[in-house]
Amino acid sequence: MKRRLVLPLAWAVMALALAAPAAAAPTREVVVLTSFPKELFEAYKQAFEEKYPGIKMVVKQQQTNQAVTYLRETRAKPEADIMWASAVDAFQTLKGDGVLDKIALSKETLARMPARIGSFPLHDPDGHYWGFAVSGYGLMWNTRYLALHKLPAPKEWTDLTDPRYHGHLSISAPSRSGTTHLTVEVILQAYGWERGWALLMQMGGNMGAIAERSFGVPEAVISGQLGIGVVIDFFGLSAIASGQPIDFAYPTLTAVVPASVAVIKNGPNGENARAFVQYLLSDEGQLKLFSPEIGRLPVVPALYARAPKGYPNPFTMKLGGVEFDDKLSSSRRNVVNALFDHIITFRHAELRTAWGAIYAAEARTGKVRAQGKNLDDGSRDLAEARRLATTVPLDGMRAADKAFNDAFKDKPEVKSRLETEWDTTAKTNYGKAIDRADQSARLR
């Protein structure tokens, strides 16, 4: 009796199993860590998943400096497969930390791409990261805003020190944006340490706002909250392609460097990560850079024949002017970012007020000179006010010293002491600059 009951039950179970839908095969993944805006990575996510339907692209969006820290902290058991960002010096840092895997590309892929853009390598010569797009750094502006406020269009970094731009500019903090860090480094390497910081400090004094993320700058300019933004080129190019009232210019002294992609060593999905890199460098992946929502520059010169009309070609244009040293930029990255924060970002209100006082005093000086009056004492006060508002509290030689940078990175007590010194010096200097500017006015 029991035997007769068991057999029908077994057949019933088998029938149910056959009738049930087959369990879906586990979806493979590639985990991508990126600082790029949603418009860019969503477009690539959709295209990549269509090309590789068995692989799900999981995106973790992080600011570049945070991503570098995250990859260092998880290197024993990586959770990400891909690092994908604009800041080439961040890749240099990660390579030095042993975080990146070495990958080889096919001969066909390599043959389509030059080794350099100008004098700068497009790829790591050892194969730890690969340029997938070219980026330049410059200025975007809202044409309607400038017309409304009767402001000229800027062309050079030095134009941003014009008193007429006071309160009309925007930049993001380099500690929160890898692309802004590169822009700051471009200026420091173009003009030298002291002169470069003097330029940055006066630019900072003209800023209407310092954004927390790089995306905040184009948003403010496109919306008309502010007139001019210091940006990576694709923010300007994509806005123009989308029909916004925006224009963009590369300053004479800028750098054209690659935005890169790398595979994380011992990441959970190494094979899928390599497929993602190959897709980015394929014709399909490269042509997607021309999309209006992306607006970036491919690394395959032949594809510019298929670019939208008027699209910049960095391989034929004379761009650059700065022999960018990514190793120098990488070595002092932490120091430069912290210094910018403590003398510009965190003291922006005082810095902006100081430059407002200086500009007002200089305007009064011009009127007094026109009357033929003696200005010696007032001129000395104004010169001192400018000196106080443009003096960086760190020597350039020290900033480039390896031991100094290592101590700043590895010893919290050293970092804390220096940051306190910089902050105190900035606050004191800007207060004195305001006093000297006001004093010069009282002598009229």
Name each region found by the language model.
Residues A25-Q92:
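Early extracytoplasmic/lumenal segment of secretory-pathway proteins
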Residues S35-E42, E79-I222:
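Extracytoplasmic ligand-binding site segments that recognize negatively charged/polar headgroups
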Residues P78-A85, I210, G227-I232, D247-A249:
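Paired acidic/hydrophobic, glycine-rich loop segments that form the ligand-binding mouth/hinge
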Residues D89-T93, I222, L226-P245:
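A ligand-binding cleft/hinge motif common to bilobed small-molecule-binding domains
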Residues M140-Y145, V257-G270, K288-L289:
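A bilobed periplasmic-binding-protein/Venus flytrap-type ligand-binding module shared by bacterial periplasmic
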Residues H168-S172, L199-G204, I210, A241-G267, Y279-P301, A305:
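Periplasmic-binding protein-like
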Residues Y359-R444:
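C-terminal non-catalytic accessory extensions
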